[in-house]
Swiss-Prot record:
Family annotation (SMART domains): CUE, SMR
Keyword Repeat part of the UniProt annotation: yes
Effect of residue 122 to A: Abolished ability to act downstream of the RQT (ribosome quality control trigger) complex
Taxonomic lineage of the native organism: Eukaryota, Fungi, Dikarya, Ascomycota, Saccharomycotina
MF terms in GO: endonuclease activity; K63-linked polyubiquitin modification-dependent protein binding; polyubiquitin modification-dependent protein binding; RNA endonuclease activity; ubiquitin binding
Taxonomic source organism: Saccharomyces cerevisiae (strain ATCC 204508 / S288c) (Baker's yeast)
One of the protein's GO biological processes: rescue of stalled ribosome
Gene Ontology CC annotation, any one: cytosolic ribosome
Domain comment quoted from the record: The CUE domains specifically bind RPS7/eS7 polyubiquitinated by MOT2/NOT4 and HEL2.
Domain Smr: 347-443
Gene: CUE2
Pfam families (alphabetical): CUE (PF02845)
Annotated effect of mutating residue 402 to A: Decreased ability to participate to No-Go Decay (NGD) pathway in response to ribosome collision
Keywords: Repeat, Ubl conjugation pathway
Domain CUE: 8-51, 55-98
Protein name per UniProt: Endonuclease CUE2
């Protein structure tokens, strides 16, 4: 290289060093020589390389923000494996996060580990997800999200989906599951705005895809729920005749009927799942609604398992679908109802004779009000300072129904229950098929 050429090379190298101070002199020199000492070409290539690196860094930082619970090295490795495709990386990381939660859950549950020793973790997770989809028709991402959030308890995830969506017209779109902490068009670390290949672009694409598939996420909503609807009447008749169904919270069954758009068969299918799963007979579910789903107190003996027959038409349910029948007599007494009182705060007198209903009501109210008084004594020297309505226990719901045998169209059970409440100075308000008892007046 001549003296003049050397001076020219050094001059161009000096310009590059001023423009790219983060790159070492030796690397800049290599770039310049590789491009035949063409300064403009070298600058253009270095700018593109720097821009690509900044874009990758920005996308990685956003992935770090989206999955703060995952190690950065895991995210970076997955990003490289997916050839720096943000969309593919998000999908894989969601699955990775689910698997990690499953492993954590199994680590805390030795029995669960033993049950799954012969089964691949991924297969086990997919089985759970498929079961949730079968009973809810939820999109896969919703099923996956609820499974992880509910400790990989399939039945609990199904129940929570029903409670969250029974009155909604559609499932939330896939894009909602990407918990991005900043809006797509904001400036990210390093002060750069994202390129068309960045995360915002991917999320926009995901939103467009969700809009295209929106019709498939819509849930059928032709059924208008009321206590007098033919479907509700039919379900009540099935419940009244069967102790297994009585073990399931009636309010939850109503929500199931709404979730399944009035399809009684599907309500019976989910009821079958609850009764078949032994652990759910003894488990108390306390979600935001605050009621108990199932309780062994309502089923004095271990319930047998059964399978649900396939029925093609809903209106055949009453004639062809029968759950295992323990007896069609009135309940065995007040004990199961009383034992479960402070879990459900509900008395259901379907199938009770008027005298049995009043006798059970008397025992329940004595226990209910005694607990309120005891709590008042523990919390204050003046128990009367709290007034006449309950402060420490929940109001009591007493379901009487409309009644097959009635006087002037009013249930005999209802008439006697109301008479008892009035005579004993209870504070209540009434609806067409139940009473809500809120306290007790001084005599």
């Amino acid at each position: 290289m001549s003296m003049d050429n050397n001076d020219d090379h050094e001059s161009k190298l000096s310009i590059l060093m001023d423009m790219f101070p983060a790159i070492s002199k030796s690397k800049l020199q290599v770039h310049l020589l590789e491009n035949n000492n063409d300064l403009d070409l070298t600058i253009g290539l270095l700018l593109k390389e720097n821009d690509d690196k900044s874009t990758v860094d920005n996308e990685l930082h956003q992935l770090y923000d989206m999955f703060p619970q995952l190690d950065c090295s895991v995210i970076k490795d997955q990003f490289v494996i997916n050839e720096k495709s943000v969309e593919s990386t998000i999908s894989d990381l969601l699955n990775y996060e689910t698997l990690q939660k499953l492993k954590d859950n199994q680590a805390n549950s030795p029995d669960s580990v033993k049950r799954n020793e012969k089964k691949n973790n991924w297969e086990s997770t997919n089985d759970h997800i498929e079961s949730i989809i079968k009973f809810t028709d939820a999109p896969k991402n919703i099923a996956q999200e609820y499974l992880a959030e509910n400790g990989f308890d399939t039945v609990k995830a199904i129940i929570k989906i029903i409670l969250d969506y029974y009155d909604k017209r559609d499932f939330k779109k896939d894009v909602d599951t990407f918990k991005v902490k900043r809006s797509p068009n904001t400036t990210v670390r390093g002060g750069r705005v994202q390129s068309s290949t960045g995360l915002a672009h991917v999320l926009k694409k995901g939103k467009e895809s969700a809009n295209v598939a929106q019709e498939s996420l819509k849930r059928p909503r032709s059924y208008k729920h009321s206590l007098d609807s033919p479907q509700m009447v039919e379900l009540n008749e099935l419940v009244a005749d069967n102790r297994d169904l009585k073990a399931i919270n009636h309010e939850f069954l109503q929500k199931c009927l709404q979730f399944y758009d009035g399809d009684v068969v599907k309500v019976l299918n989910i009821s079958s799942l609850l009764i078949e799963d032994d652990k759910n007979i003894t488990k108390t579910w306390n979600f935001d609604e605050g009621f108990t789903l199932t309780s062994r107190d309502n089923c004095k003996q271990h319930l047998p398992k059964f399978s649900t027959p396939q029925i093609s038409r809903r209106n055949e349910v009453g004639n062809t679908y029968k759950l295992p029948l323990h007896d069609k007599e009135t309940p065995e007494g007040a004990v199961p109802v009383i034992n479960n009182l402070f879990q459900t705060y509900r008395l259901d007198f379907h199938g009770f004779l008027p005298s049995e209903a009043v006798s059970t009501l008397k025992l329940a109210l004595n226990k209910w009000w005694s607990k309120e008084v005891a709590e008042r004594e523990l919390n204050s020297h003046n128990i009367n300072s709290y007034g006449s309505k309950v402060q420490f226990v929940s109001p009591l719901i007493v379901v009487t129904g409309r009644g097959i045998h009635s006087i002037g169209g009013i249930s005999k059970v209802r008439l006697q229950v109301k008479s008892f409440l009035e005579k004993n100075h209870y504070i209540f308000w009434e609806e067409s098929s139940y009473f809500r008892i809120e306290g007790k007046k001084k005599k």
